[in-house]
């Protein structure tokens, strides 16, 4: 089970799902999704990991139940500021971070900026820099005639996802605005622009002081060779692991292996 929490971010209210209670003896884990995603992506992983710690899954600004930014300030540093707001509100001295795709870039940059606040970091399926511009966005439908159509779309994109998790993810990805009209639950801005394409975090990657785990999906468009180079440049590498027959959305298509890798990493000596 999870409960919704809201905190004030840099441009409005931020929504997050908290799984499990914060315990004095256990560092909380913060998990973050990627562009056009939402906190529900992590539901199965967070449920599994919350047996031993609190897990908080954040809806990034402009996504899920978090407020949209009126100024459309969606650059990665703005999300780092939001993450700082969430962690300050939670009031713990240290955190573990795990982020998929854009969430991985946000988590990495936070860890580089606030090394004393991050105990361990996991970065899932992302490259540190990009050749594409922020306007080169993969086409995707903005609207659907039914939730069944959303499910059909997400099943094609994520063929290995467990049915129950895929349904949760798909249904929470849209809002019903008319009898036969469902719209994506994120700012339409992200159908046109992906501002993280301006990021280059190689230098920050090399500055990380915490143990860092990397996970890659075998079917992902993210290049394994680039993630291997990331691993080679880390000060404190904790391994690079590829999940077989898994696409870009690792927590959605392979929640059990992701949870297992994270549990082992977070409890290592």
Where are these regions (language model features)?
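Conserved serine/cysteine hydrolase catalytic core
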Residues: 178-233, 242
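Serine-hydrolase catalytic-loop signature spanning alpha/beta hydrolases and amidase-signature enzymes
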Residues: 34-44, 55
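Alpha/beta-hydrolase fold catalytic core
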Residues: 1-29, 51-53, 93, 239, ...
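Active-site loop/oxyanion-hole signature of alpha/beta-hydrolase fold enzymes
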Residues: 10, 17, 23, 44-47, ...
């Amino acid at each position: 089970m999870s409960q919704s929490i809201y905190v004030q971010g840099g441009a409005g209210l931020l929504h997050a799902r908290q799984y499990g209670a914060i315990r004095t003896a256990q560092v909380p884990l913060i998990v973050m999704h990627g562009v056009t995603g939402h906190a529900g992506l992590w539901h199965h992983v967070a449920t599994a990991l919350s047996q031993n710690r609190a897990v908080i899954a954040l809806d990034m600004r402009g996504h899920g139940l978090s407020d949209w930014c009126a100024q459309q300030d969606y650059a990665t540093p703005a999300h780092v500021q939001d993450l700082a707001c969430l962690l300050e509100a939670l009031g713990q001295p240290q955190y573990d971070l795990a982020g998929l795709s854009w969430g991985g870039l946000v988590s990495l940059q936070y860890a580089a900026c606030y090394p004393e606040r991050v105990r361990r970091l996991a970065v899932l399926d992302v490259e540190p820099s990009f050749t594409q511009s922020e306007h080169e966005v993969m086409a995707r439908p903005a609207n659907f005639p039914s939730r069944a159509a959303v499910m059909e779309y997400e099943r094609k994109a994520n063929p290995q996802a467990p049915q129950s998790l895929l349904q949760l993810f798909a249904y929470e990805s849209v809002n019903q605005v008319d009898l036969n009209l469902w719209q994506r639950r994120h700012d339409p801005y992200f159908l046109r622009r992906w501002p993280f394409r301006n990021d280059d975090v190689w230098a920050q990657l090399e500055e990380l002081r915490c143990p860092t785990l990397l996970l890659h999906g075998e079917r992902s468009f993210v290049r394994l060779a680039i993630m291997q180079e990331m691993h080679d440049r880390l000060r404190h590498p904790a391994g690079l692991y590829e999940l077989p027959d898994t696409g870009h959305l690792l927590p959605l298509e392979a929640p059990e292996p992701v949870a297992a890798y994270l549990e082992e990493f977070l409890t290592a000596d």
